[in-house]
A protein has these predicted regions:
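N-terminal, active-site-proximal structural segment of metallo-dependent hydrolase catalytic domains
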Residues: 2-11, 15, 21-102, 113-116, ...
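Active-site-proximal beta-strand elements of phosphoester/diester hydrolases
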Residues: 33-46, 133, 157-167, 174, ...
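Active-site beta-strand/loop signature of hydrolases that rely on acidic residues for catalysis
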Residues: 34-41, 59-87, 122, 149, ...
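Surface-exposed cleft-lining segments at the edges of enzyme active sites
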Residues: 44-45, 134-137, 169, 173-194, ...
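Active-site environment of divalent metal-dependent phosphoester hydrolases
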Residues: 45-46, 75-79, 114-118, 168-171, ...
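Extracytoplasmic/secreted proteins, especially bacterial periplasmic and envelope-associated proteins
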Residues: 51, 55-62, 91-98, 117, ...
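Structured beta-strand-rich core segments of catalytic domains in phosphoester-bond hydrolases
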Residues: 73-169
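Metal-dependent phosphoester-hydrolase catalytic domains
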Residues: 203-214, 220-324
């Protein structure tokens, strides 16, 4: 049996009851389980900035991930308001080294970005920045950017792609937002972003299907594998992004594959728009994977004044890989 995995499972079960109970840290014995934690934690963890991010850091420490992927990893607003910070007032991204250290991570890197919504990866392991992706003008702009990183765990190199696609119903930079939304311009633009990201990461590598790759982020798109829940028309453009991934890459949708026929929302409402994909060699090493609904993350509370949520409008995803 995998003793560290058992300890983690027991601790995670306890954490589901109450965040204050349990400890998901690894044992002191050699641990060959790579734990990856992803979360769009909303506006640079806006909800916990006034607390010095201490609640957030304590929550991360309980899960003891080896690698974290954060969407919306920059401070944007003043605490508990929707008033924008001046650039010099923003704690993140400049101080990610300090925040990561609070939960035991030594390394961090940022993806390419054009606006206030970058992704950041933090790790116990050295991070190689393969590429920072922002797309190309005029019509292949990757709005929130993306990143291709690489870490080595137990002698095995793992490629990590991070992303956060365009969120609106209308296309990026459209002149007529109403007309664009009526033509599903946002869905079509997200497809362009996904094509660009994949073609400049996993599709560039001839034998990527034999390597360890994962791709995580806020896709702002639904998958037709969840249509048993949505019950939309088969040609619905909201499926375009994940149709492309499923039909053109070797990626496997981890949550869908491990929980066939089930629906696991990743936002405060009822939509699954956050995903972690991985290639078969990595998928075969999964020992645990789930959307994290614990005492800290479940039932996000909307702040009526700002329309933001405590702690976030999204839920995290955690995956364990046995890397012996």
């Amino acid at each position: 049996m995998n003793t560290p995995k058992i300890l983690r499972t027991i601790a995670t079960a306890a954490l589901m009851v109450a965040v204050a109970v349990g400890c998901a840290s690894k044992s002191e014995a050699e641990d060959t389980t790579l734990r990856v934690l992803y979360w769009n934690f909303q506006n640079g963890m806006w909800s916990d900035e006034p607390n010095g991010y201490n609640n957030f850091a304590a929550w991360v420490r309980r899960y003891d991930p080896d690698v974290c992927i954060w969407c919306e990893a920059q401070t944007i607003y003043k605490p508990y308001t929707n008033e924008a910070c001046a650039p010099e007032e923003r704690y993140l991204v400049a101080n990610w080294d300090k925040l990561a250290a609070k939960y035991g991570h030594t390394y961090w890197a940022i993806g390419g970005h054009r606006d206030n919504y970058p992704q950041v990866i933090t790790s116990k392991l050295p991070i190689e920045v393969v590429s920072q992706i922002i797309g190309e003008e005029p019509d292949s702009v990757v709005t929130h950017g993306a990143g291709h990183f690489r870490v080595e765990f137990n002698g095995k190199k793992v490629n990590i792609v991070t992303l956060h696609t365009w969120p609106q119903k209308y296309a990026y930079r459209t002149k007529d937002k109403e007309a664009s939304a009526a033509e599903n311009g946002g869905d079509k633009y997200r497809l362009k972003e996904m094509e660009y990201i994949c073609k400049n990461t996993i599709e560039k590598v001839a034998d990527a299907d034999k390597e360890y790759w994962l791709m995580a982020g806020d896709y702002n798109s639904r998958s037709r594998v969840d249509n048993h829940f949505y019950k939309w028309e088969e040609n619905d453009t909201r499926f375009l992004v994940h149709d492309y991934i499923r039909n053109n890459t070797p990626y496997i949708d981890i949550i869908a594959e491990r929980f066939p026929g089930e629906f696991h929302t990743t936002i405060a409402g009822k939509s699954r728009i956050d995903f972690i994909y991985c290639t078969a060699p990595l998928y075969e090493r999964i020992v645990d994977a789930y959307v994290v609904n614990d005492a800290y993350t479940k039932d996000p509370v909307r702040d009526e004044k700002t329309n933001f949520h405590f702690p976030s409008d999204h839920l995290p995803i955690l995956v364990d890989y046995e890397m012996k």
